[in-house]
C-alpha cells in the first residue's frame, strides 16, 4: 500500500459545524485516520472579498464557482458583523475528532487575518496569534496541541521561528515534496515540516481539470508522486458540496493500493535522518499571492 498523508483544513464556522461531522462519518466508514487542523477564533472569511480586485484571486473564485462551492454564508462571514467564535461553539466537536483517532492540530486563530496580515505582523503579533489559537484549541480538546499547519500556507522563516517557541512535534506550513528539518534565521534547526505535495481541488478545477474528472486527476497525481505524498482537503469543500466526490475518491484509492493516513505517521523514528532545508516565499500555481515553499539549502 502507498501511504498518503491526509490533511484536513477546517477554515470556517460552517465548515466546522457541517463539514467536520460529514468527514468524520466517511473516514470512519473507510477506516481512515487523518490530521484535522482547526481554525478556532473568529470566522472573518468574508473579509477576503476585497481581494476580488486582484486578478488572480478573482479568476480563482470564478473558475472554482466559489458561491456554489462554499455558499454565500461562508463567503460573507464577518463582513458586516463580528465573526462567530468557532472553538467557543464547537470545542466538543474538536475533542470528539481527537477521540475518534485523528490527529488534531492548530490551523489559525483568525484564518482570514493570518492570510491577509502575516507578512506585516511583528514577532509579538505572530506570537499572540499562535498563543490565542493554542489556548482555544487546548481548552477544547483538553490536551496539549502538538502540531500545526499555517493558514493558506502563509509561512516563512519568521513564522517558523515564532512557532519554535511552542514546541510542536511537527508543522505542515509549506508546499514541497518530502518531510524535512527547516533551518531557522538564527542557524538552529526547527521542528519537522511535513509539506503538502499535491494540488487541492480549488487550485486545479476549472483550469487543469473538470470537476467530474478530478478524482482520476488526483489519483494519477498520487501515483506519480515520487516524494512523500500529502493531500489537503477542506471541510468546506470535501465535507460539504463535494462530499460524495470525496467518498468516491476513497473507494478509488483503496482499489489502487493507496492508504490515507495522519501526517504524523509519515515520519521516521529517527528525525535526524531527515534532510535540512528552508522555507521561502514563492508564487504557487492556482494560488494568489505568496506561499511558503520548501527549498533545498543550496537553492535558498
UniProtKB/Swiss-Prot annotation:
CDD domains per the UniProt record, alphabetical: CE4_ArnD
Superkingdom to which the source organism belongs: Bacteria
Reactions that this protein is recorded to catalyse: 4-deoxy-4-formamido-alpha-L-arabinopyranosyl di-trans,octa-cis-undecaprenyl phosphate + H2O = 4-amino-4-deoxy-alpha-L-arabinopyranosyl di-trans,octa-cis-undecaprenyl phosphate + formate
GO biological process: 4-amino-4-deoxy-alpha-L-arabinopyranosyl undecaprenyl phosphate biosynthetic process; lipid A biosynthetic process; lipopolysaccharide biosynthetic process; response to antibiotic
Database matches in SUPFAM superfamilies: Glycoside hydrolase/deacetylase (SSF88713)
Family: Belongs to the polysaccharide deacetylase family. ArnD deformylase subfamily.
Protein function: Catalyzes the deformylation of 4-deoxy-4-formamido-L-arabinose-phosphoundecaprenol to 4-amino-4-deoxy-L-arabinose-phosphoundecaprenol. The modified arabinose is attached to lipid A and is required for resistance to polymyxin and cationic antimicrobial peptides.
Protein name, UniProt field: Probable 4-deoxy-4-formamido-L-arabinose-phosphoundecaprenol deformylase ArnD
Species in which this protein is naturally found: Yersinia enterocolitica serotype O:8 / biotype 1B (strain NCTC 13174 / 8081)
Amino acid at each position: 500500500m502507498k501511504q498518503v498523508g491526509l490533511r484536513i483544513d477546517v477554515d470556517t464556522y460552517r465548515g466546522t459545524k457541517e463539514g467536520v461531522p460529514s468527514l468524520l462519518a466517511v473516514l470512519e466508514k473507510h477506516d481512515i485516520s487523518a490530521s484535522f487542523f482547526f481554525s478556532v477564533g473568529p470566522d472573518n472569511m468574508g473579509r477576503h472579498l476585497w481581494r476580488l480586485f486582484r486578478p488572480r484571486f478573482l479568476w480563482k473564485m470564478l473558475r472554482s464557482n466559489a458561491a456554489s462551492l462554499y455558499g454565500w454564508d461562508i463567503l460573507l462571514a464577518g463582513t458586516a458583523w463580528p465573526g462567530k467564535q468557532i472553538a467557543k461553539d464547537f470545542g466538543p466537536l474538536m475533542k470528539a475528532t481527537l477521540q475518534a483517532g485523528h490527529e488534531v492540530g492548530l490551523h489559525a486563530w483568525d484564518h482570514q487575518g493570518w492570510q491577509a496580515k502575516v507578512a506585516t505582523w511583528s514577532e509579538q503579533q505572530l506570537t499572540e496569534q499562535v498563543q490565542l489559537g493554542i489556548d482555544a484549541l487546548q481548552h477544547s480538546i483538553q490536551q496539549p496541541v502538538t502540531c500545526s499547519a499555517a493558514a493558506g500556507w502563509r509561512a516563512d522563516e519568521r513564522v517558523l521561528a515564532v512557532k519554535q517557541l511552542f514546541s510542536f512535534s511537527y508543522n505542515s506550513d509549506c508546499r514541497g515534496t518530502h518531510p524535512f528539518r527547516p533551518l531557522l534565521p538564527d542557524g538552529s534547526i526547527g521542528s519537522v515540516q511535513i509539506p503538502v505535495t499535491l494540488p487541492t481541488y480549488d487550485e486545479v478545477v476549472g483550469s487543469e481539470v473538470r470537476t467530474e474528472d478530478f478524482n482520476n486527476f488526483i489519483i494519477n497525481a498520487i501515483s506519480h508522486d515520487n516524494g512523500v505524498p500529502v493531500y489537503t482537503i477542506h471541510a468546506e469543500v470535501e465535507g460539504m458540496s463535494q462530499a460524495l466526490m470525496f467518498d468516491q475518491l476513497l473507494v478509488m484509492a483503496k482499489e489502487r493500493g493507496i492508504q490515507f493516513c495522519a501526517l504524523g505517521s509519515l515520519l521516521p523514528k529517527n528525525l535526524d535522518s531527515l534532510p535540512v532545508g528552508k522555507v521561502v516565499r514563492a508564487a504557487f500555481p492556482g494560488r494568489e499571492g505568496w506561499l511558503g515553499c520548501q527549498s533545498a539549502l543550496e537553492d535558498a
